Swiss-Prot record:
Its EC number is 1.-.-.-. The keyword Transferase does not apply. This is Hydrogenase-4 component F homolog. The keyword rRNA-binding does not apply. The chain crosses the membrane at residues 1-21, 25-45, 54-74, 120-140, 153-173, 202-222, 235-255, 270-290, 307-327, 368-388, 402-422, 442-462. GO terms for molecular function: NADH dehydrogenase (ubiquinone) activity. It comes from Methylacidiphilum infernorum (isolate V4). It is a multi-pass membrane protein. It comes from the Bacteria. It is found in: Cell inner membrane. The gene is hyfF.
């Protein structure tokens, strides 16, 4: 099974699910196609095809592909009960259900195509496709707030993708004198092998546009404006895949271009730019936590913080920092998506996302309440969770490079920790408020993620360590 499989399954899903209005059948088919994509990604661990004109699979993008398709599958599983409840209470209709499931598969199709692509132009098109899918799903409720969030996402995302397109074009122009015209000058494999000969002035300008353009998709400060609204107003499964997956895909694009700069002796150093944007994102998000009143907005800002940590790590560079960045990306994706699984059911039960109205969850709904406690403690970076391990490694590598930068990052992490604990106490403990009626829930996706995050904090298999170390070398 080749990279084409993880692209083919969601493509078939788009065509089929757009024709099915039964939510029971369509939700199971959505889960089935997502599962098949995940199985296809597992096969890539054991058999990697040689690079072709359009597809490239190496140890680096397999990390992203596997993570994307695992969380894509578990989120589809979570969506079954969540979307069924939205249908039952009249928030969604059968036509919108067809749209939701076909767009969900379009999102997976776009992300997988971007990650498997051996062409800088095809990557750009794929990320734009994935973005448009989520833009449409954010506005699926057709409320004033959701349409406004969707429009804001579309405008800011459009600006970002336009800048990324211009940056991509500059890299293509820089490669033509050495590689030649056409698709050859757009292939990652050719660009990697000729990186030292690319026009450094064009490459430098191009990377600035790439960083700003794709950085908008990552949600880095000050390009984050779309992210809190999109998380708060869209369906919770989309919040989970936005935070857990799509932000990673945009960061992957930045990292691929960063590798090209690292191999060019005359190009600028991309690391300090990425470090600065990452640190600014952490500090900004940490301060904004204290003012949040909506629980989904709170964790949207948490995503800004953690994408900042990941960017900071890759900006610092070196074997340890790159390893820590990959580990933190994996832990954040698993933890944050699981938190949104819990929040999705909680908001349906309580019929609100206001933090002030969600108190006493550990008493009224112990499974969800304590699950949220676990998730918040994990995402806050407390031991023995995997996030603690990755943050410790990021700080260690930063202290070795620049104690001042490490101290600034530590201040941001401690500030964020205090805010999250404060909000956790408000939500999980105290006198229960609001509706406590049970709804049909599926906890397997949430607890499977938490189990992996806990296990990674206790023991990482040597094979995984070796894999991430090889990826760290690719990232230089």
């Amino acid at each position: 099974m080749s990279a084409a499989a993880v692209i083919l399954f969601p493509f078939i899903g788009i065509l089929l699910l757009s024709q099915i209005s039964s939510y029971r059948i369509s939700s199971w088919l959505n889960t089935l196609f997502s599962f098949l994509s995940f199985v296809g990604s597992l096969f890539l661990l054991f058999k990697k095809d040689p690079p072709g004109s359009f597809f490239l699979v190496d140890e680096l993008n397999i990390v992203f592909i596997l993570l994307t398709n695992f969380i894509g599958f578990t989120t589809a599983l979570f969506s079954q009960r969540y979307i069924a409840h939205e249908i039952e209470i009249g928030h969604l209709s059968p036509p919108s259900l067809r749209f939701y499931h076909s767009m969900y598969q379009a999102l997976l199709f776009g992300m997988n195509l971007a990650l498997c692509s051996n062409n800088i132009g095809l990557m750009w098109v794929s990320i734009e496709m994935a973005t448009l899918s989520t833009v449409l799903m954010v506005g699926i409720y057709r409320t004033t707030e959701s349409l406004e969030a969707s429009w804001k996402y579309f405008i800011l995302g459009g600006v970002g993708i336009a800048l990324a397109l211009f940056g991509t074009f500059l890299f293509y122009i820089s490669a033509r004198p050495t590689i030649g015209e056409g698709l050859a000058a757009m292939a990652w494999t050719n660009l990697f092998s000729h990186a030292a000969y690319l026009d450094s002035s064009l490459v430098n300008i191009g990377f600035i546009f790439i960083l700003i353009g794709y950085g908008t998709k990552v949600g880095l400060f000050p390009l984050h404006g779309w992210l809190p609204d999109a998380h708060a107003e869209g369906p919770t499964p989309i919040s989970a895949v936005l935070s857990g997956l799509l932000l990673n895909v945009a960061l992957y694009a930045i990292l691929r271009f960063k590798i090209l700069l690292s191999a060019n002796p005359h190009a600028l150093q991309a690391g300090p730019l990425l470090t600065a944007m990452g640190l600014a994102s952490v500090l900004f998000a940490a301060l904004m936590f204290y003012k949040r009143r909506d629980i989904k907005r709170l964790f949207a800002y948490s995503s800004i913080e953690h994408m900042g940590i990941i960017s900071f790590a890759f900006g610092i560079g070196g074997a340890l920092a790159n390893f820590a960045g990959l580990l933190h990306m994996s832990m954040h994706s698993l933890t944050k998506s699981a938190i949104f699984f819990a929040i999705g059911y909680i908001s349906q039960i309580k019929r609100t996302q206001k933090i002030a109205d969600l108190s006493g969850l550990t008493s009224s709904h112990p499974v969800l309440g304590w699950g949220l406690v676990f998730g918040v403690l994990a995402i806050a970076g407390l031991p023995p969770m995997g996030v603690f391990m990755s943050e410790f490694l990021v700080l260690s590598s930063a202290f070795a490079r620049s104690p001042l930068l490490a101290a600034c990052l530590a201040v941001g992490l401690i500030t964020a920790l205090g805010a999250l604990i404060l909000k956790l106490v408000q939500v999980s403990f105290g006198e229960p408020r609001g509706d406590s009626s049970p709804i049909r829930s599926l906890y397997l996706p949430m607890f499977s993620h938490f189990l992996l995050v806990f296990a990674a904090g206790v023991y990482i298999p040597p094979r995984v360590v070796e894999w991430f170390q090889h990826c760290s070398v690719l990232l230089k």
